[in-house]
Amino acid sequence: KEFPEDVGLFFVMFMHYLELSPGEAVEIHPGVPHCYLEGECLEAMACSDNVVRAGLTSKHKDVATLLRIVDYPSTSHPKIKLPKEVTKGIKEYPSSYPDFKVVLVESSEEVTLDQGFPFLGIVLEGSATTQHLDLQQGSSYLILEPACIQPTPYLKFYLCGVNS
């Protein structure tokens, strides 16, 4: 609809179509083309010096680089992952990458975040207080040390940190 004459439209026919429910995740390996069509998406990436666009965007497109690095596996859809509860109110998404892990703090009771620092996080719903911060919906935070998080009254807080 937004890019009706973009040649990137043909590329869509070669991609897997997945429909995820809230809270579900997929792990996409380096070099595998991906995009999302609608909704909200949290994307965590390993350290890299490239994001290569080939279409469906008004930003710079680098088709030559994409063709050089692309890895298009002929396997079935990526496996949908759900987070595993680490402790009450804290869930972790399984990651095969040492570079990062994604953690979800979702609670209406106090929780203690005590490992995996530093974390970069965004509050999707609710608010909370910690010893040093007031966490507000729509804001992002850098968490450098253990924190007791007291939701006021509910918190949904996604964090990305080093996978230890």
Language-model-derived ranges and their functions:
Residues K1-V7, L37-E40, S107-Q137:
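Glycine- and acidic-residue-biased ligand/ion/polar-headgroup-sensing regions
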Residues H34, S48-N50, N163:
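Short loop/turn segments at secondary-structure transitions that flank enzyme active sites
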Residues K1-P22:
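Conserved AWS/pre-SET-to-SET junction and N-terminal core of the SET lysine methyltransferase domain
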